[in-house]
């Protein structure tokens, strides 16, 4: 991660100060800190330089750069080193899985296979912040969302292949005399259906009223304008904003958390409701954000981009204009998530189903000759695995299918309770307990 173009300086948020380790012979380095030629010239002494005599200049320079992630071996053991705090947050799950993939001749593990795009606080059903909306857009909030924001979002989703889940609130302000007008609810629900998208509920409000009170006040609105629509997902800025879990509507099956909860992993809020924290805001994508997304995709095949439109209605500065926000989300989705197109685009309720299956799945694995066998327990419909190979190719899958998503990495779809993966140019391995990763829950 290096600033190479004007304007990228604001993306650089990785720790620039780390201990400077130069690695020895037999080391495989995965990540290094970058230094200018001048800094290397002024800092590296002749004794260290002598160790790299005879190497090509560029190779010697790369060997001198401060190592961040590297691996060495002692007899048959492989020792991995992490120079920094990269194992202190959610990034650890991806780093550890990558280490496992580098340790063995092959590695296979389950993933969720879900890529969400959550649009929080869309659309507007009341003319809130009217003066500011007129000043910026010469239209009411309702018109801004229907005539400007909505067409832009559908265009972005169409170009990127993303599926939207729009988290709706009748209003942000409950202490004024303005009442929401739901005449456009049917319009949006129809448009969402056409886009293969869905609607959920938003817990946001300006006054921060308890969720139970907000749900109570919103209930009449939804019963009047969307009596037959089942809202199965809810958006909240964080777990604390949910308050008492009993306040959740009975039909809610999953809760999406805002970008402030990006350090958490998917799981259960309670025995009935899953939790899907944001993995990115979609607007701001720093180098560290990108690294965390890569780690999450490596470990789980999962991302949950959360674009909160509250700031469109209540902007704090020029950066909150929809023109600038839409350009950023379109550029980021089209650039930084392109590498993960092999994973499925999903809505929140679709990813909720996959998360439940992922967490319930038990599996074992064994290899004999060219065949890797996966016996599965508690499989409910489809399950997905990532298989990492070194110098081998998958040629056939019985009980499912496969797709090579990058060199040596395969996405395996399991459709039966036992899956056999045939690889090319393999030898025969027999693994005893503790000798190979693969048993898992």
Question: Language model features by range: what are they?
Answer:
Residues 93, 191, 205-226, 271-297:
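Alpha-helical scaffold elements lining the catalytic groove of polysaccharide deacetylases
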Residues 84-191:
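Active-site beta->alpha N-cap acidic-glycine motif
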Residues 123-127, 151-247, 304, 309-311:
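Metal-dependent polysaccharide deacetylase catalytic core of the NodB/CE4 family, i.e.
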Residues 6-114:
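A glycine-centered loop/beta-turn motif at secondary-structure junctions
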Residues 84-85, 104-109, 113-126, 152-157, ...:
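Catalytic grooves of carbohydrate-active enzymes
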């Amino acid at each position: 991660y290096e600033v190479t173009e004007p304007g990228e300086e604001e993306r650089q948020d990785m720790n620039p100060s780390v201990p400077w380790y130069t690695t020895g012979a037999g080391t495989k380095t995965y990540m290094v800190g970058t230094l200018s030629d001048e800094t290397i010239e002024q800092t590296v002494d002749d004794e260290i330089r002598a160790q790299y005599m005879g190497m090509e200049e560029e190779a010697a320079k790369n060997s001198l750069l401060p190592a961040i992630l590297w691996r060495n071996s002692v007899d048959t053991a492989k020792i991995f080193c992490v120079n920094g705090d990269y194992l202190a947050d959610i990034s650890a799950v991806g780093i550890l899985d990558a280490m496992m993939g580098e340790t063995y001749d092959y590695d296979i593990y389950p993933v969720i296979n879900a890529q969400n795009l959550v649009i929080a606080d869309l659309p507007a059903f009341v003319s809130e912040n009217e003066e500011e909306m007129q000043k910026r857009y010469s239209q009411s909030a309702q018109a801004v969302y229907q005539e400007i924001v909505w067409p832009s979002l559908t265009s972005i989703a169409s170009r990127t292949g993303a599926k939207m889940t729009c988290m709706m609130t009748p209003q942000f302000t409950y202490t004024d005399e303005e009442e929401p007008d739901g005449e456009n609810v049917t319009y949006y629900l129809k448009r969402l259906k056409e886009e293969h998208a869905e609607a959920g509920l938003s817990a946001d409000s300006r006054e921060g009223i308890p969720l139970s009170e907000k749900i109570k006040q919103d209930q009449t609105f939804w019963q009047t304008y969307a009596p037959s629509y089942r809202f199965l997902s809810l958006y909240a800025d964080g777990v604390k904003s949910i308050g008492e879990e009993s306040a959740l509507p009975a039909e809610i099956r999953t809760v999406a958390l805002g970008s402030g909860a990006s350090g958490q992993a998917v799981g259960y809020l309670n025995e009935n409701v899953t939790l899907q924290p944001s993995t990115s805001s979609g607007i701001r994508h720093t180098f560290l954000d990108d690294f965390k997304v890569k780690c999450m995709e490596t470990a789980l095949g999962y991302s949950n981009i959360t674009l909160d439109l509250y700031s469109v209605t209540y902007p704090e500065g020029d950066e909150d204009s929809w023109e600038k926000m839409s350009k950023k989300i379109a550029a980021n989705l089209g650039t930084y998530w392109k590498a993960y197109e092999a994973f499925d685009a999903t809505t929140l309720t679709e990813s909720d189903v996959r998360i439940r299956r992922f967490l319930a799945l038990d599996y074992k694995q064994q290899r004999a000759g060219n065949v890797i066998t996966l016996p599965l327990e508690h499989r409910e419909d489809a399950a997905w695995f990532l298989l990492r190979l070194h110098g081998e190719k998958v040629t056939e899958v019985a009980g499912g299918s496969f797709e090579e998503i990058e060199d040596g990495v395969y996405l395996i779809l399991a459709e039966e309770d036992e899956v056999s993966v045939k690889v090319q140019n393999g030898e025969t391995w027999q693994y005893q307990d503790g000798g190979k990763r693969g048993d898992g829950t």
